[in-house]
Amino acid sequence: MAKIVLYYKSKCGATKKYAEYISSKLNCEMKDAISATDEEIDEYDTIIYGGGVYASAIIGSNFLNNHQHVLKNKKVIVFAVGITEYDEFTSSESLFRKNIPQSLFNEIYTFNFLGSIDCKKLKFMEKFLFKSMLNNIKNKASYLKTPTDNIIIKHWKKGIDLVDFESCDELLDCAKISKQIINED
């Protein structure tokens, strides 16, 4: 039977929410990426990694660098959770190219999910980065603003929660397919 494990690194909690949801749907173990060892990873057929996006970096993506020699022989699924959405104007490929080792890039399945943010809980530098992003959104031409951009502009002071578990369906299907293929052998 295919063994699946989900590693994650969460800062504001949205990535952990997705990790809990995905692991419950796949009936797989969920672990903090910090505790991962090569020996442990080698016990699984499919590795899912999730991390929050901050300043174009997927937190904990060093997990992929540190374990790439073991991950090369596995099915690897990576999901990134951030407050902005990717569309035809902003490609998520550049985010993943910056954060996934070149040796793994073409073999990994990648997904983006919308997260949450509570500005009251941000540290000084995080607030600075968020306000910079907010200014960029506000300065976009109106026809380029996405519905998410408008939500961020309107509600950023109160906190924003855009977590949407239905957006996980494609990732779940991807992981289930590998489980079925291995079970058929």
Predicted regions and their residues:
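FMN-binding flavodoxin-like domain, especially the glycine-rich phosphate-binding loop
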Residues: 46, 56-185
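N-terminal beta1-alpha1-beta2 submodule of the flavodoxin-like/Rossmannoid cofactor-binding fold
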Residues: 1-72, 173-185
